[in-house]
């Protein structure tokens, strides 16, 4: 595909569209976990009285439903499932149906979540409806992201960067929306309703952006040239892009420029190598080359999802009740995590250390397991076994800074190193494997969160 023949992206409309699509894909997950106090208060029997739901640093008196854990697990299991089913779906369901259908389904399910703010119901049915919504929303999100990654694989890598930038802002956007809801001064029920309507508006904008792409000459040029190799490229691009997405954690746009080696400028070179295509690389051979890097990726996400947000969302301020104690968790847990994780991912734009041959990488990854007891020993009032050894707010903030930066950097580093450990024709298989291990790490972490919470 000759890049010189491509039309210009007038007013950067295609870039803006993919940025908004990136933002829309991760808004649901981020808005659910950031609103944990709201859900836990409803499940604790607060009914429809939201007067103290969004205005206090309250995580539920007992959290008998283990909402933190279940919302994390039921968000990540669909990712693992659809990672395995993606190749089947891509062959059987047209791309437009996958993308537009997923967006509409997410919109309707989130509208249901917003409507429930006004509905008074007992905790049991509310929990069941919410968990079903979480599961279905994240199933559709997994299909949506995989399909959009396929489209991005046919376009210049700049648009992958813009897409990831949008996804990277989703967590920050959700945290800011929560803070604005709490500080708005309106009654709490209206505040909660406005909070949950916000992602609906984001999804609507995503639908408009997707529908506008066929009407933009620049998008038509690249998407019309989608060849039979697009599905293979989709898997490879997806693995490199997914370094940030499925757990709602932001990504560095600079990092993508490093990892997306298959730019469109290099695509023409792959076509003359068509005779090599019958020699499909062995999955086992590729796994032997990247197994340590893949294991590191699994362990990084296992540690992160085992305590975030299941444990970290339960940490409260040790100061006397006031404005700071109300805003402590949204700021120090969610906003701080998303910002520092993004900065951690950005570091790989400037250096990649340790390299793929170093044994220091597994050591650094294993050291992150120390964060599990550190967070468990912070100021979590709802506990029956472990003592509180780090009651001051400064401890939690320091741990969160290091936790978030290390997560962002090590995830970005492992996803960057994996393609360098295999031959060019093996990258498709390596990409599919890394995508699977990413989803596996998220699911393992979400499952372990039940154990760690029980040990508190």
UniProtKB/Swiss-Prot annotation:
Q: Glycosylation positions?
A: 48, 57, 225
Cite the entry's keywords alphabetically.
Cell membrane, Glycoprotein, Membrane, Phosphoprotein, Transmembrane, Transmembrane helix, Transport
An annotated GO cellular component: basolateral plasma membrane
The answer to whether keyword Nucleotide-binding applies is no
- Give compartment(s): Apical cell membrane; Basolateral cell membrane
Q: Which residues form the signal peptide?
A: none
Tissue occurrence: Highly expressed in skeletal muscle. Expressed in liver, lung, placenta, brain, heart, kidney and ovarian tissues. Expressed in testis at the blood-brain-barrier.
Q: Which InterPro entries match?
A: ENT1/ENT2, Eqnu_transpt, MFS_trans_sf
Effect of mutating residue 456 to R: Reduces drastically localization at the cell surface and induces an significant reduction of adenosine or thymidine uptake
Question: What GO annotations for molecular function exist for this entry?
Answer: adenine transmembrane transporter activity; cytidine transmembrane transporter activity; guanine transmembrane transporter activity; neurotransmitter transmembrane transporter activity; nucleobase transmembrane transporter activity; nucleoside transmembrane transporter activity; purine nucleoside transmembrane transporter activity; uracil transmembrane transporter activity
Cited Pfam families? Nucleoside_tran (PF01733)
Q: How is this protein positioned relative to the membrane?
A: Multi-pass membrane protein
> Per the UniProt record, which residue ranges are transmembrane?
13-33, 70-90, 99-119, 124-144, 162-182, 193-213, 291-311, 324-344, 360-380, 386-406, 432-452
Into which family does the record put it? Answer: Belongs to the SLC29A/ENT transporter (TC 2.A.57) family.
- Give the free-text miscellaneous remark of the entry: Transport activity is insensitive to nanomolar concentrations of the inhibitor nitrobenzylmercaptopurine riboside (NBMPR). Inhibited by higher concentrations of NBMPR (1uM-10uM).
Q: What does this protein do?
A: Bidirectional uniporter involved in the facilitative transport of nucleosides and nucleobases, and contributes to maintaining their cellular homeostasis. Functions as a Na(+)-independent, passive transporter. Involved in the transport of nucleosides such as inosine, adenosine, uridine, thymidine, cytidine and guanosine. Also able to transport purine nucleobases (hypoxanthine, adenine, guanine) and pyrimidine nucleobases (thymine, uracil). Involved in nucleoside transport at basolateral membrane of kidney cells, allowing liver absorption of nucleoside metabolites.
Q: What is this protein called?
A: Equilibrative nucleoside transporter 2
């Amino acid at each position: 595909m000759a890049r010189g023949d491509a039309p210009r992206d007038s007013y950067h409309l295609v870039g803006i569209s993919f940025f908004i699509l990136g933002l829309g894909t991760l808004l649901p997950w981020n808005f659910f976990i950031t609103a944990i106090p709201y859900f836990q208060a409803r499940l604790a029997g607060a009914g429809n009285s939201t007067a103290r739901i969004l205005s206090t640093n309250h995580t539920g008196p007992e959290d008998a439903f283990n909402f933190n854990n279940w919302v994390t697990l039921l968000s990540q299991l669909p990712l693992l499932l659809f990672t395995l089913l993606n190749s089947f779906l891509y062959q059987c369901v047209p791309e437009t149906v996958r993308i537009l259908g997923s967006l509409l389904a997410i919109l309707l399910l989130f509208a249901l979540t917003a409507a429930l703010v006004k509905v008074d119901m007992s905790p049991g049915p509310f929990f069941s409806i919410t968990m079903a919504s979480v599961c279905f929303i994240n199933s559709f999100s997994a299909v949506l992201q995989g399909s959009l990654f396929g489209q991005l694989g046919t376009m210049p890598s700049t648009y992958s960067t813009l897409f990831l930038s949008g996804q990277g802002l989703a967590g920050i956007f959700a945290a800011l929306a929560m803070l604005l809801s709490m500080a708005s001064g309106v009654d709490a029920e209206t505040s909660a309703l406005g909070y949950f309507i916000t992602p609906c508006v984001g999804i609507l904008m995503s639908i408009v952006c997707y529908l506008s792409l066929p009407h933009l000459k620049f998008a038509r040029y690249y998407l019309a040239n989608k060849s039979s190799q697009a599905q293979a490229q989709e898997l490879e691009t997806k693995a490199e892009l997914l370094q940030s997405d499925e757990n709602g954690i932001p990504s560095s746009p600079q990092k993508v420029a490093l990892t997306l080696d298959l730019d469109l400028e290099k695509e023409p070179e792959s076509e003359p190598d068509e005779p090599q295509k019958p020699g499909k690389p062995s999955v086992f051979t590729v796994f032997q080359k990247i197994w340590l890097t893949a294991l590191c990726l699994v362990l990084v996400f296992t540690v992160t999802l085992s305590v975030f947000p299941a444990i970290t969302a339960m940490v409260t301020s040790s100061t006397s009740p006031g404005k700071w104690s109300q805003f402590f968790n949204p700021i120090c847990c969610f906003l701080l995590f998303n910002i520092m994780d993004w900065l951690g991912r950005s570091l790989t734009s400037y250096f990649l250390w340790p390299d793929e041959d170093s044994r220091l990488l597994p050591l650094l990854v294993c050291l992150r397991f120390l964060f599990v007891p550190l967070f468990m020993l912070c100021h979590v009032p709802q506990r029956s076994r472990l003592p509180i050894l780090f009651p001051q707010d400064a401890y939690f903030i320091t741990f969160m800074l290091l936790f978030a930066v290390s997560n962002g950097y090590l995830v970005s580093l492992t996803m960057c190193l994996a393609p360098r450990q295999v031959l060019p024709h093996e990258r498709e298989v390596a990409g599919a494997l890394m995508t699977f291990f990413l989803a596996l790490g998220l699911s393992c972490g979400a499952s372990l969160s039940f154990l760690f919470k029980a040990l508190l």
